[in-house]
Structures are given as C-alpha cells and as structure tokens.
C-alpha cells in the first residue's frame, strides 16, 4: 500500500484506532456499528440506504476524539440460496480524527478512508418472527492508499452470524462478527520497507439489541464489545516488539428511534463498562438514518373467477 502524502502523518494515525482502545487494536469493523439493526431478519425485497455516524470521546487526557461515518447500500434481491434471501451490500466507512493536544501543540484534524466493504448477507426466515443470517464480506484495504494504521496494511476478511426476533414490534438481536487478516501485512514504498511486516491479531465483535416499537417510536437498550484474539508464539513476540498490546472494550447504552415515513432515525448513546486498559473508557454517540430507496411492487390481487357463468 502506498502511503503517499499521508506518510508524514503515519505516527498520528497509528495513535488512533477504530476500536478506541489500546494502541494497535485490530478491529476494522466499528464496534457498535450494527446495534439497533435486526441483522438476522431477511429484508423485504428492495434497495436500502443505511448511514450510521458515530462520535467517540475517550477519557484519556489529550486523547484524540474520533468520528466514524458508515454509509451502506443493501439490495434485498428476493433470490434464494439454500433457502436464504441473498442481500448484497456495499459500504465505504470514513474515520475522522479531532486531536486534543496540550497547550502549545497545534491540533490538526484529519480523515482516513477505510477499505471499501463488499459482500453479501444470507438471511433465513425461520417463521414466528425468528430469523438468522450469515455475512461474508471483505474490506478491500489495499485499494485505498494513503493510510498509516496497521489495520489497513492488508485486506480485512469479515464474517458475521446473527439471530433476530422481530415479532410484535420487538427487535431482539445478537450479532457476532469475526475480522481476520492477510497477516503479516505491510505498506509499500520507502516507509513500508522501513516499518517492515505488521503482525495482526484477529478480532471478535458482539452487538446486542433489545428494543420495542410503540407506534412510530422505538425505545430500548443496546450493548456491544470487541476483543482481539490471541496471537500465537513468534507472531505475538513480533507484534509486541512493534508496540501491540491486546485490546478490548464493552459498552452499554440506550436507543430511541422514530419512523418519519420516508426514513427512520435512531439516536443512541453508550458508555464503556469494561476495558482491557484502565483509564481508556469511552462514551459513544450514534445517529443513524435508514431509508428504503426502492421497494418491489406488491403482486396484484387475483380477482376470483366464477366457476359457472350465466349467459
């Protein structure tokens, strides 16, 4: 990967991780990115736009505030594979950094494009409001140059397993996401040669949702967490020499949503209740908009035909 004009800012980027925990946390998927969504339930046939904006404030003094915008397009095709509704998706996350340096040190805001996510959800309707889904996707990190975070030195492969209960206005969803990498990854160019190979730990993320709709309103609780999976043997020693420490966090919060008709809005606030590194707790605020761009026309009702006609 070519660092290009961002090469000089690689040190600043390396200090900001998507999971907002200890340095070199390895999750490319944003923790909490999918809370509030019934990911396990098949979508009605159509095309949907979902935009999630997250602002994260860390308790560490002089730490950089981060904001993440995740726009997603999902096409619920109506086609089946092994009984599952096929739902291709495309996303282009962007991370923004807002430094809070001590007096005398200039602050310089920046943004980083995360690798484009392409993949598909396969969702099964089990009946009685129950649904399960499997996500297979990849963040094409090598296609987006100019970034200095170790997570982006290789493609991120992503799979997800979700279950949802959506009857009677409920959204009870558990979603487990696994990130794994082309490890060791590396950046190209002179800076990449100087840094050398980067040894990346896989990551697990859990998103939990429990909400209820009351008319057009939706109210409930959300929780989410992320942890690195252990690196083995030599890879752990090599990663530790590069500054890697295991990272993880778990946050709990609330959700309120409203159906405006053409689109639905959700607001969420969550706070870390457990972190691997004490003093790195964060508070997250979420804004999400969900809009159907196209809905398949409903089949016309068939009028009954008399068995006998009288002439």
Summary of predicted features, one role per range:
Residues 47-49, 84-90, 132-136, 165, ...:
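Transmembrane beta-strands of outer-membrane beta-barrel proteins
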Residues 94-199, 243-246, 259, 311:
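Outer-membrane pore/translocation modules
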Residues 33-35, 47-49, 67-73, 114-119, ...:
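Hydrophobic, lipid-facing positions within transmembrane beta-strands of outer-membrane proteins
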Residues 40, 74-78, 121-123, 160-166, ...:
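Transmembrane beta-barrel domains of outer membrane proteins
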Residues 54-56, 91-95, 137-141, 177-181, ...:
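Outer-membrane beta-barrel pore domains and translocons
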Residues 19-25:
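Sec/Tat signal peptide C-region and signal peptidase I cleavage site
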Residues 29, 33, 54, 186, ...:
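Outer membrane beta-barrel transmembrane domains
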Residues 38-46, 77-87, 125-133, 166-170, ...:
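Short loop/turn motifs that connect adjacent beta-strands in outer-membrane beta-barrel proteins
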